[in-house]
Amino acid sequence: YTCAAADGPTTTPVNAYNIYLQLIYDNAWGLVAAGTNRHNLKTGPGIPVAVIAELDRKVDDGLPYTGTFQFSLWASNGAAPAAPAATSCTTTAAVASTWNANNGNTNCGGSTLF
């Protein structure tokens, strides 16, 4: 891959669902306006909530807004995940939220914080 400002097939790797990943230093992860910039790797959207929830349980604490793996609204070449609600990836926009792992949503994403 060659570094460039715009995402593209020669500049950006994709996830298993053919959506671009993002390695960046920003605060666009977890709860909206997380505040602190961190190096992070975003999975991109398009991942089923059951898969992203299981990934979080395997590598972190299993909760979308705590730990080193958190929910992310970021989207590049895919549709952005829906904001927290009963039909979205997470139950609420609060630290105590959980993944909506059984609702069948197929458009979720996460971010690994470094």
Question: Each PLM stretch: what is its role?
Answer:
Residues 1-114:
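Low-complexity, acidic interaction segments enriched in glycine
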